[in-house]
A protein has these predicted regions:
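Residue-level signal for WD-repeat beta-propeller blades
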Residues: 47, 56, 93, 101-102, ...
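Residue-level structural signal for beta-strand termini and adjacent loop
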Residues: 68, 167-168, 189
Length: 210
């Protein structure tokens, strides 16, 4: 059966030749599961700072799989991306989140939303972009320079919580909406950070113009 397989750390240390195919639960009330990327020939794998797996295939483009290997985050092909070919020979991920794909028809790059992590979060390395956020901007607001699994809280100047979550790698993406999914009003918003262990990090500001 085609598809990715893995060798556990314990089996490596014991010089075992036992490989495992990862199963994804169907979550349909049954105990059934399906193999990850079953019958897909994987040629190369790269892992980003968020522990997501970028899998290049022989004729199916690139799959991005979540850190727990249970969710397909993205699937790039020649039909929905600038990939010149669906035959992927190699994938390289840079610390700034830029991903290079080597295909049999040439190179292609993609700016992902995950950057390398920082051990310490300081005012010198934690920042948001674009900043200010102008009225015609419709994309995500990215906070970078974070530690692994950092806790993020975005609050208004009067202390109202508008968004919270955890970083993926050294980055966090915010859609500019509050907890109810509404676009926030013009103003200054504070990004409060803390480490996975609960230690306070730094604060950066985002200016939004509607």
């Amino acid at each position: 059966t085609l598809g990715p397989i893995y060798l556990s750390k314990m089996n490596v240390e014991n010089e075992s030749s036992e490989f495992t195919q990862h199963k994804i639960p169907r979550n349909d009330g049954t105990n059934y599961a399906d193999y990850l990327l079953s019958n897909v020939e994987v040629r190369c794998i790269a892992v980003d700072a968020g522990n997501r797996k970028w899998m290049g295939t022989t004729n199916n483009g690139v799959y991005v799989i979540s850190n727990d290997c249970n969710t397909e985050v993205k699937h790039f092909t020649t039909e929905n991306s600038p990939l010149p070919s669906n035959l992927i020979k190699d994938i390289i991920i840079m610390p700034n989140g830029l991903v290079y794909f080597a295909t049999d028809q040439g190179l292609c790059s993609y700016m992902s939303d995950v950057t390398a992590t920082n051990e310490e979060m300081t005012k010198d390395n934690v920042y948001a972009y674009p900043n200010p956020v102008k009225p015609d901007y419709t994309g995500s607001i990215n906070i970078v320079g974070l530690s692994f699994h950092a806790d993020i809280k975005i609050v208004s100047v009067n202390g109202t919580l508008v968004n919270q979550g955890k970083s993926t790698g050294g980055s966090y993406s915010w859609d500019g909406c509050d907890l109810k999914g509404r676009k926030v009003a013009s103003g200054i918003y504070m990004v409060e950070t803390a480490t996975e262990e609960g230690e306070k990090g730094t604060v950066c500001k985002i200016a939004i113009i509607r």
